[in-house]
Regions:
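Ser/Thr-rich low-complexity repeats and stalk/linker segments
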Residues: 1-188
């Protein structure tokens, strides 16, 4: 063997694209996002948040990684890629859009008004109308209706004779909640 002309086999093969154990949530109230996944053993995983490197995780010999990221308020774009010991970079994962929203949704009850008195049997079924966050889930005494893309919601409700307590809960995509309660009286 001619030692002067020895060739070294340089690793030019990029690592496999890292794989997340589960798809990140689309919306969260928390600014903290915990990620777990799999990548080439003893490599590094680079986390890009809004196209900027935000963290780096070491991959174990078993090929696993975990990382906690801090999200910005509003929309966040997340992508990750791997770097092996030779410095080869994998392709990036697809981009994940994650909305961080810590604000409770608005909840306005337009009709009926709190304290309203409804009379006559023909008026026993009332129309409840209100406004909340776009696409929020609205629960009225445990029964769900959805707000439309502009936040409007409307549903019919059957009143019992006497005082009726109506409990409203609005829940947005990030699971923030707003609660309200009104009382409506029904007389035959």
């Amino acid at each position: 063997i001619d030692k002067d002309n020895a060739t070294t086999d340089k690793d030019n093969v990029p690592p496999q694209v890292p794989v997340l154990a589960s798809t990140p949530v689309e919306a969260t109230f928390s600014a903290s996002l915990n990620l777990q996944g799999f990548a080439e053993p003893k490599s590094k995983v680079i986390f890009l948040l809004n196209s900027v490197k935000s963290a780096e995780a070491e991959v174990t010999e078993a090929g696993q990684f975990t990382q906690e990221l801090t999200l910005n308020e509003g929309l966040n774009e997340l992508a990750i890629y791997g770097v092996d010991a030779a410095g080869n970079e994998s392709l990036k994962t697809r981009s994940y859009l994650i909305s961080q929203d810590a604000e409770a949704p608005i909840l306005e009850i337009k009709t009926p008004k709190d304290g309203a008195v409804i009379e006559l049997k023909k008026n026993r079924t009332i129309k409840i109308e209100g406004q909340s966050e776009a696409n929020a889930k609205i629960f009225i005494n445990g029964r769900m209706t959805l707000a439309d893309s502009e936040g409007n919601f409307s549903t019919d409700f059957y009143l019992n004779e006497g005082k009726n307590t109506l409990e409203f809960i609005a829940i947005d995509k990030a699971t923030n909640k707003t609660q309200k309660q009104i009382e409506v009286e029904f007389k035959l």
